Amino acid sequence: MAPSSPSSARPTRASGRKRSAMAEEIHQNQEEEEEVVAASTAKRRRKAASSGKKPKPTPKQAKPAVAGMKKKGETEKTEPVVDDVCAEEPDEEELAMGEEEAEAEEQAMQEVVAAVAAGSPGKKRVGRRSAAASGDHVPEFIGSPVAAAEAHSNWPKRYERSTAANKPEEDDELKARCHYRSAKVDNIVYCLGDDVYVKAGENEADYIGRITEFFEGTDRCHYFTCRWFFRAEDTVINSLVSINVDGHKHDPRRVFLSEEKNDNVLDCIISKVKIVHVDPNMDPKAKAQLIEHCDLYYDMSYSVAYSTFANISSENGQSGSETASGISSDDAGLETSSNMPERTATLLDLYSGCGGMSTGLCLGAALSGLKLETRWAVDLNSFACQSLKYNHPQTEVRNEKADEFLALLKEWAVLCEKYVHQDVDSNLAGSEDQEDADTLDKDEFVVQKLIGIRYDGTGRKKGVYFKVQWEGYGPEEDTWEPIDNLSDCPLKIREFVQEGRKRKILPLPGDVDVICGGPPCQGISGFNRFRNRDEPLKDEKNKQMVTFMDIVAYLKPKYVLMENVVDILKFADGYLGKYALSCLVAMKYQARLGMMVAGCYGLPQFRMRVFLWGALSSMVLPKYPLPTYDVVVRGGAPNAFSQCMVAYDETQRPSLKKALLLGDAFSDLPKVENHQPNDVMEYGGSPKTEFQRYIRLGRKDMLDWSFGEEAGPDEGKLLDHQPLRLNNDDYERVKQIPVKKGANFRDLKGVKVGANNVVEWDPEVERVYLSSGKPLVPDYAMSFIKGKSLKPFGRLWWDETVPTVVTRAEPHNQVILHPTQARVLTIRENARLQGFPDYYRLFGPIKEKYIQVGNAVAVPVARALGYCLGQAYLGESDGSQPLYQLPASFTSVGRTAVQANAVSVGTPAGEVVEQ
């Protein structure tokens, strides 16, 4: 595993010893330390640059580094150990975030009410257009009408008689008296299949369409029907077409053919336009010749539903056979063989966290018959990297910034070209002899081996660094050296690069089949009061979206799956969501965007997230898996993305499983106290529900091949069943919260609920104090959300769900208390709410483990997506429909046949709303 990015000061053993001091001392002595480091480094580098040998330091025993992780004393300031105890009071940010969540919840409810009042958009296409008639000419049809039998056969709905009781509406299809094959407008003859410009509204660019019908309506008016082409700016991408971020640019001559059609009066036609269809996989030279003499070209189709840009199956523009519902399914069920799949694909997990997304994708792909291997992972959080590496030992896990990872990939390609692809033996022939012939100074020694590589983009000397193992010294004396310092060691560099390329420690373009990741966009956070609404990408906190797309552009994987919060579709008119979609389309990827709710795939939490598929034109565009559990989806999306919710149509009545509740998830786990120091323990009981039996399965039964055919460590043990320890004051408070559904701080002595559900002090009850002298009911609880909140010290219940799994476990302003115990939910309980298998072990302080779990993509959602990915990769789906109905056996694959013990967990609480 690669270490974290180096700090601004060059790490040496001298600086490493200083950096092992307390953080306060580091801060006070930082400038002095940098001067010392700079001086010592300069001297040593002069020696190394001339000889490739290292000055001998004063030996010192170093603390052992965590396996696969960076030694803190060498390359960065030591991070203080986080105290795994709940803070005494919520800080200002915590309270503000809570109020922001409450406001968002209220706004979501208002959106739902407004949507209900306005009527459901259903499947209405928002891309409809009506052209404005103009001109003084008299357009006319040419020739005889199409034979009646042929016309009735080709356009049957045009000749259906409408009942007198039904008044025609705007969306109703016009009725025809007869059809024609050609027409004349402004003395120009137009035929069926011609591409034309059509008059648009005022201040709008002319529409572009393909004529599919000429007919005389029952009202004696002359009409034509157009199948519309969309410019990039006419699609959901909209204004993002004009931006230019790191080469992201659309070809103005490129248009997209849609299935959208409208009827317009004949004199709306302006002129012909020459449009050619280009195979997206055509050779660039042939493509350039083909489009040289045309006005426009198209290589993909566009659909408003799921903001889809996809291949066109044939040159005549037919989009293939589509079912009426837009849903495909596999009634054959799943193969449940325990053998490892034969077909393999490689995965790069960016912003991986502890690996929830890639783990789920691999599990789902295995069910489809594809062995998807997480070969590389990148994340800035060292604890998350440690967790991922432990659970996926074959993965090259890099603890570094994504932009430095990209810079390293480009430098790695240069090194591979120099030391692997070219014949460098002649150039290096005398290098080893020269190195051996050099006389060693008494304060120097020889480079034994290079054992790591990274890119430093923040230090004084930017560029590639190698981790050097020095001859005669142990691993605690390894150091990072810039490549310039190793100019006299080309054989060592060649040896490292050739071995690294053989092992593929870093991917080159063409090595990666799938890239997944969720680039953080903290610049759109509600707590960020300085959000840049006009140009979100200029906010440094949103730049990772650009980096993610830059990595995609460089590596050109077959598939891309980006996950993010729904706010990317809401903030600044969906700027970031549109940017991501626009980038993929500009890079000639097929693309599709959908919103999925975790609870719909077998979890007792809501959590709605955005998932963006991308697929090379040579591959099948994956579908979205339809829900398998009966969860009511609430909370809308902006109008531009109103048709992107992955759900069944309102008219459909699918057979879904009953929504899961908290009791289904963790009612089998043993009781633990507020302070639980053991991260490994026994279950002490059997599973009680189907979910619990499944979540306890081992890796092989889950089709998790991270450890090959072998069972992984700790299987069968209960891991990370530890709560964040409440401080003494909060523990006293929690012990007085009643064990009942809906209990919270309002049940404590001295609190009274007044008008409008606002809490107030009970004048008849003297204020109660804790043993520390602090009040039983803290002031912040009384004032939170203007006294209307039910969240402070709120207790969950067995028959409920949670809106989302949080990254912090403090009970001050959220409902997170265990249903029957005086503590918050444990890490394992939260992990189950995210669908992590029980064998998945986490590393780091307790607070860090909560963060890893809360930031992860829900594993069952990723698993369902992985199944659809596998089907597309293997060519077992055609990509023509956006949705896929999972086989009935999908939710029970791999589960044991043991009957569940009866357990009463209540009934579903009904609709759930994301907060």
UniProtKB/Swiss-Prot annotation:
Residues 345-876 form the SAM-dependent MTase C5-type domain. Its main location: nucleus. GO terms for molecular function: chromatin binding; DNA (cytosine-5-)-methyltransferase activity; DNA binding. Residues 81-107 have a biased composition (Acidic residues). Pfam families: BAH, Chromo, DNA_methylase. Residues 315-328 have a biased composition (Polar residues). Residues 188-313 form the BAH domain. Residues 1-107, 152-171, 315-338 are annotated as: Disordered. It is found in: Nucleus. Residues 445-508 form the Chromo domain. Residues 42-57 have a biased composition (Basic residues). Its EC number is 2.1.1.37. Disulfide bonds: none annotated. The active site is at 521. Keywords: Chromatin regulator, DNA-binding, Methyltransferase, Nucleus, S-adenosyl-L-methionine, Transcription, Transcription regulation, Transferase. The keyword Cytoplasm does not apply. InterPro entries: BAH_dom (IPR001025), BAH_sf (IPR043151), C5-Methyltransferase (IPR050390), C5_DNA_meth_AS (IPR018117), C5_MeTfrase (IPR001525), Chromo-like_dom_sf (IPR016197), Chromo/chromo_shadow_dom (IPR000953), Chromo_domain (IPR023780). It comes from the Eukaryota. One of its GO terms (cellular component) is nucleus. It catalyses: a 2'-deoxycytidine in DNA + S-adenosyl-L-methionine = a 5-methyl-2'-deoxycytidine in DNA + S-adenosyl-L-homocysteine + H(+). Gene3D superfamilies: 2.30.30.490, DNA Methylase, subunit A, domain 2, Vaccinia Virus protein VP39. May be involved in the CpXpG methylation and in gene silencing. Belongs to the class I-like SAM-binding methyltransferase superfamily. C5-methyltransferase family. This is DNA (cytosine-5)-methyltransferase 3. It comes from Zea mays.
